[in-house]
UniProtKB/Swiss-Prot annotation:
Residues 59-71 have a biased composition (Acidic residues). Belongs to the TRAFAC class OBG-HflX-like GTPase superfamily. HflX GTPase family. Residues 48-71 are annotated as: Disordered. Keywords: GTP-binding, Magnesium, Metal-binding, Nucleotide-binding. Mg(2+) binds at residues 298, 319. One of its GO terms (molecular function) is GTP binding. The keyword Isomerase does not apply. It comes from the Eukaryota. PROSITE patterns: G_HFLX. Residues 285-449 form the Hflx-type G domain. Its cofactor is Mg(2+). This is Putative GTP-binding protein 6. Pfam families: GTP-bdg_M, GTP-bdg_N, MMR_HSR1. The gene is Gtpbp6.
Length: 514
């Protein structure tokens, strides 16, 4: 069995075989010590005694089995070293056809690449190289002369411990060639972003989604390495009479892992749907805040909600786990802000797809807020990247069209005025534009959810006022001179207003103009 595991993938586990649950007779005395995890709930025996949890009556707890399966799926070696790294950022500067404007300058592409490296604890940029490349998809990425120059520079810098090739994906043969030529680990943008995600992910769901996103990377590694291992023999081409070569065995293990991850994520998706249903039942409007990574989404939500527990960080992908935060609009209507994962240019589609369960919350929002960091030189490219990604998520057209555009960090751009009508200039640090944003949010939320602001005349001695406090948002109660009635201003849904008129037909006149 140990040989079997070694044949699959270093650091990669074969699918577990579900353990048989043994029910021990009370008369049997175990000769080995046992450890009680929770009194009266689970006892773990020795390995020779059958292992695994022993439950009273032989009944399995499905939740424990689910957790065990999830824990197993989350066990995987890191994609990149966890220790200190001094990285050479190598950027292929692709020449554009004459007359075609580049999407971004090499300078800012390198700056973003360096920021990704520095987002990891203990990692630093030892050097940066911008090298012309006519065909970055070729085997060696660069032409013969440029490749020779790059090799000399990398080998001449003793401080470098690894090389970040700033391309979306590197073909396995290219990775092998470059690592052989330079004697260092070489990784691409996809691998680095996945590693950053791994380091920042906190919830089981985010970690599961990352494990699924890693499958193509592991599969390409299997396809590259296993052929060599087959040719080198491994003692025998076939393992334990299974009729499968190491390549086939490892590929099958990956297929099984992918299926199990998708099953677990679907289970987690179902739980998320239940949470959404509860929010709908309680009629909390939901506002999703989206934008490029490190554009200031979390800081903005903190300014809107006053939630001290939020801890914004000035680094890419500081937010990976979708979080929900309650806030009040000027009308005193309570809404929920959803802080989402930031987007990035040249982010592989399957990585976004892996986070579809998390980003599904965006599709069910009432209002979308698109935040753009206008202090960044590539603000327009970042904005286009976010819009392109949102369109790829197949969001409802009405939600996309009604999105509020927020230009953030305007305190870093003196005298800034939005170039397009409808955009809101906001600084979460100085407070500029926050009141205008709250007013715009309120108008959008009321419109999207069918709520309205009404002033109703109700009797103070009856149950009407108490009902309104429970079913609507009471903004103001103005007692009338007669003393037994009041004008009550409320934010109320059309459905709730219909129920109010049905319950109190005599005392519910038409709403007064507001």
């Amino acid at each position: 069995m140990l040989f079997l595991r070694a044949a699959v993938l270093p650091g990669f586990w074969l699918p577990r075989v579900r353990r048989v649950q043994l029910v021990r007779s009370p008369a049997v005395t175990l000769p080995s010590p046992v450890r009680t995890v929770h009194a009266g709930s689970r006892v773990w025996g020795s390995a020779w005694a059958g292992g695994g949890p022993v439950r009273g009556g032989g009944e399995e707890d499905p939740r424990e089995d689910e957790e065990e399966e999830e824990d197993e799926l989350l066990r995987a070696p890191p994609l990149l070293p966890l220790d200190t790294q001094r990285v050479c950022v190598l950027h292929p500067d692709v020449k554009r056809p004459a007359g075609k404007k580049p999407r971004s300058t090499a300078e800012w592409q390198v700056a973003e690449a360096a920021a990704l490296v520095r987002a990891l604890p203990g990692w630093s940029v030892a050097s940066t190289l911008v090298v012309p490349s006519a065909a970055p998809g070729s085997r060696l990425v660069f032409g013969k002369g440029n490749f020779q120059d790059v090799t000399e520079k990398i080998k001449g810098c003793q401080d470098i411990t690894s090389v970040f090739l700033n391309v979306e994906r590197m073909a396995p043969p290219t990775k092998k060639e470059l690592e052989s030529a330079w004697g260092l680990r070489v990784f691409d943008r996809f691998t680095l972003v996945l590693h950053i995600f791994r380091c920042n992910a906190r919830t089981r769901e985010a970690r599961m989604q990352l494990a699924l996103a890693e499958i193509p990377l592991l599969r390409s590694s299997v396809n590259t390495d296993s052929g060599q291992q087959d040719q080198q023999g491994w003692g025998s081409r076939y393992i334990m009479g299974s009729g499968e070569s190491p390549t086939e065995l490892r590929a099958r293990a990956l297929r099984d892992r992918e299926l199990r991850l998708r099953r677990v994520l679907e289970r987690l998706r179902d739980k998320r749907r239940l949470m959404r249903k509860e929010r709908v039942r309680r009629e909390f409007p939901v506002v999703s805040v989206v934008g490029y990574t490190n554009c200031g989404k979390t800081t903005l939500i903190q300014a809107l909600t006053g939630e001290a527990a939020l801890q914004p960080r000035d680094q890419p992908f500081a937010t990976l786990d979708v979080t929900v935060h309650a806030g009040l609009l000027p009308s005193r209507l309570r809404i929920l802000y959803v802080d989402t994962i930031g987007f990035l240019s040249q982010l592989p589609h399957n990585l976004i797809h892996a986070f579809s369960a998390t980003l599904e919350d965006v599709a069910y929002s009432d209002v979308l807020v698109h935040v753009t960091d206008v202090s960044h030189p590539d603000a327009e490219l970042q904005k286009a990247t976010v819009l392109s990604t949102l369109r790829g998520l197949h969001l409802p057209p009405a939600l996309l069209e009604s999105a509020l555009e927020v230009h953030s960090k305007v305190d870093l751009v003196p005298g800034y005025t939005p170039p397009c009508s409808g955009a809101l200039a906001v600084s979460a640090i100085s407070g500029r534009g926050l009141d205008e944003l709250k007013a715009a949010l309120e108008a959008s939320v009321l419109r999207a959810t069918g709520r309205q602001v009404l002033t109703l005349c109700v009797r103070l001695g009856g149950p009407q006022l108490g009902w309104l406090y429970k079913e609507a948002v009471v903004q103001q109660v103005q007692e009338l001179p007669e003393g037994d009635a009041a004008h009550v201003t409320v934010v109320i849904t059309q459905a709730a207003y219909g129920r109010f008129r049905k319950l109190f037909p005599i005392d519910a006149p038409s709403a007064l103009p507001h």
